[in-house]
Amino acid sequence: MTIHRFKAFAATFLAFSLILFASGCGGGSNDDRSPIDFTNGATLSGSIDGAPFKIAVPPADQWNGILLMHVHGYRDRARTENEKDNRVAEAAPGGEATEQALVAQGFAVAGSAFSRNGWAVEEGLVDTVNLTEYFKQRFAPPQATVLLGVSMGSVVALKSIELFPDLYQAVIGLCSVGGGATRNFDLALGVLLAYDIMYGLPENFGFPAGISSNFDFDNDFAAEILQQTQVPEGQVGLEFIRLVSNITSEAFAKDLFSLFFFATEALSELIDRAGGSPIQNLNASYSIPDIARIQLEALGFPAGQIVAGMNQGTVFPANPESRSYLVDNADFSGNHNAPVLLMHTIHDGFVLPANQEAYIDLLSSQGRGAQVFGTYVDSVGHCNFTGSQIGASIAAMGKWLAAGIRPTAADFPEALGFDNNHTPAPFPY
């Protein structure tokens, strides 16, 4: 199934799924749809159409009526015979410890591992619907289903409330890709262009003529990036990439390898799915701060020349069909009425904090600003949250749903590491 048809016939798909579930068909290894007695609570795992899942619920009389549907982040898809995909389903971020804590607080939790790894947004949309309907049949219809989307999972979550407004009531987005996938993958092109001008990318990556659809970061590039961090010539070049990408020093040091993984292997995997390259830089304007350029050139590094070379290289168009694939399943219209709570670390070198502001701006531009609230955590690294911080976001959303009270800064105290006065740097290009 392509996401184009999936989007166009979302309502039809959902109705068809309900028919399948009601008849007991289409459930892979979990064809049993009979109700489960959860008087004393229950934990259930299995697989639906090739997607492993896990569900945990509190005793029936202690359930607060909310189903937290965990939507996991990016998982590497095996590229070599020596690799093995992670197919473990987790019903909450952090696995069993978080699951048990949330169940003890009265939440039902569930999560799918999806039927495929990699940039599995298309699969995530379908598999999350399947698991949500499965939960309703085996246990009980929740009063509210909240999508708890982490990193790439936030794309699934934010897209799902547009496609299935009757199925999901709210979203909590952690380290969200709120600016949409096309914008973020286009940013990767800037990283690649800068590196290629300075050092040359691995030949088997195929940049720029035709990026490989089967590139393995660990085997083909990780050692070279490590070496660059250990020699002066590499260090100054990486600093240039940090500057042109508008990433904080702390975040760049923490997320360096994740950034290059995303720009190479994750992009390669996406190209395999999309049937061509979905990224482009035709309207990009690359730059670094003047003071940084002067400092780098004082060290003998030709920062100005490299910036000029990058701007001469804004000639990469996307494959139109591949671009449409990414737009359709991973960019947002903002057309929904659900409350959305977003939380991001201040220093994130993988998914820029500007993503959070982009989503807030999207809804605000449509007069929906009251539907979204964002907060920041003073920590370094992608999705580097504590359990208490995640718990605060869930508690705030619970209050929002129960009483209609939109969160405020008071729900996210400094004592827990929140910074509600932070304004992130904008997208670099």
Language-model features: where?
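Short, surface-exposed "cap/lid" segments of acyl-processing enzymes
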Residues: 49-52, 58-101
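Primarily recognizes the serine-hydrolase "nucleophile elbow" in alpha/beta-hydrolase
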Residues: 144-198
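Bacterial Sec-dependent N-terminal signal peptides
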Residues: 18-37
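Conserved alpha/beta-hydrolase "acid-adjacent" motif
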Residues: 350-355
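N-terminal cap/lid segment of alpha/beta-hydrolase-fold proteins
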Residues: 31-63, 310-312
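Gly/Ser-rich "nucleophile elbow"/oxyanion-hole loop immediately N-terminal to the catalytic nucleophile
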Residues: 62-63, 131-151, 167
